[in-house]
Each structure stands twice: as structure tokens, then as C-alpha cells.
Curated annotation (Swiss-Prot):
Lineage: Bacteria, Pseudomonadati, Pseudomonadota, Gammaproteobacteria, Enterobacterales
Membrane spanning residue stretches: 4-24, 27-47
Record bears the keyword Transmembrane: yes
Subcellular locations according to the entry: Cell membrane
GO cellular-component term (any): plasma membrane
Name the UniProt record assigns to this protein: UPF0391 membrane protein ETA_06630
Topology of the protein relative to the lipid bilayer: Multi-pass membrane protein
Keywords: Cell membrane, Membrane, Transmembrane, Transmembrane helix
Length: 53
């Protein structure tokens, strides 16, 4: 999950450096969404724990 966030962040930085503002904004937004979803899933798994079968 965090790997995808970092990939989108790198894409946003490269696009911004090359002058593609719209693409950079979209990639940065996607990176934020992926990071938030990853953190939420991490917190849910942290609080629920492993269930014994």
C-alpha cells in the first residue's frame, strides 16, 4: 500500500518538475488517498488483532 503511495508521490514530483501541473496535482491527490487508506487499514488491523481459529 505504501509502495503505491510513494510511486504516486514520485510521479507527482517528476510531473511538477517537467511542468505538468494537472498531472502532478492528480498524482499527489492519489498518493494522499493511498496513504490515508493504508493508515486506516493499518489501524483497523492493529485494533482487531489476529483471530485464532
Amino acid at each position: 500500500m505504501f509502495r503505491w503511495g510513494i510511486i504516486f508521490l514520485v510521479i507527482a514530483l517528476i510531473a511538477a518538475a517537467l511542468g505538468f501541473g494537472g498531472l502532478a496535482g492528480t498524482a499527489a491527490w492519489a498518493a494522499k488517498v493511498v496513504f490515508v487508506v493504508g493508515i486506516v487499514i493499518f489501524l483497523i488491523s492493529l485494533f482487531t488483532g489476529r483471530k485464532k481459529l
